[in-house]
Amino acid sequence: AKTFYYVASVTAAYRKALDQYLANPASDTFDLPYSVLDELNRTSHRHYSPGFYFGKEKALQTPSHTYVRDWDFIGTVDSWEDGVAHCTQRSKFCLGDSLEILQPDGSVVPVTPEWIKNAEGEAVDATPHPMMQYTIPCATPLMPYSLLRMQKRQ
């Protein structure tokens, strides 16, 4: 089963690819935008290969059957008002972490919150509790159901 984060990320990538192609469908060449593969690499996935596209004789197998998980889904945006995003935690992040917010329209907003406040309005250093309600500053207007993610620490 795939998570709604996976579905949202893959749908955003496919939408970008389709829009790019449909901008000039009569063209003999189509270069997939880097942003499409970049978005696909932000989800949990197995290594990519052309598989059997070039026939059984030239089939390529991936080097590993393990999943690539370089990014964590860390929360959802419930609402945004006056430069403040109201969010629900899915995984922990800490003050100073660099985040990305994937909006329902496929746009991505980078943000490094200057503060985090819990549901009581108290400043906190992290979001350690499952389904914790918190707020962070974000100057860019955000749509409800936007998804927060963070690159895993090495």
Predicted regions: what they are:
Residues 1-154:
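Surface-exposed amphipathic alpha-helical tracts and adjacent flexible/coil segments at the periphery
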